[in-house]
């Protein structure tokens, strides 16, 4: 199951007819990320994210995706405590944009959507309204639209960055092993990392 499928349950295009009375209440925890073993990161985030978590590359050479490792076992997020509080210093933008996301239409246009199963959605007026009483986007929705738009732009930049890494043959297969308190050894395979020696020569 992909990272997006684990987070977004019921994605719907945002519009004033369906979401005219909907508000988004602030939820302090990140319970929606509980089952994520990794989270995609943008190239622009590498500096901030790398100081807090390991960044590796998954996927085929023509479709590489940089991700931050959050755990080793399936459905394990070690950065989330029992109270759903994030314990790391940096939260990837992939998580910060939730419950919003772009969906690509048949005509290749991008539509802003929301996960209607998000626990912070309200219809009682609490939280940030998506539309005002006249059916116009609120400043909050405009802010989130801008955030997701910038995310999408940086996603395209990241794709080109990964293609360049692959073309320069700077990536190499890697694995990770960890022993838990019970002495059980777990091994994570199927990803690549940057070959530092090759990287230093360019």
State what each model feature region is.
Residues 51-53, 96-100, 173-174:
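Short small/polar-residue motifs
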Residues 1-70:
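Short, extreme N-terminal leader segments that mark the start of a protein/domain
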Residues 4, 28, 35-37, 51, ...:
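Generic, low-specificity signal for short hydrophobic/alpha-helical stretches with a mild N-terminal bias
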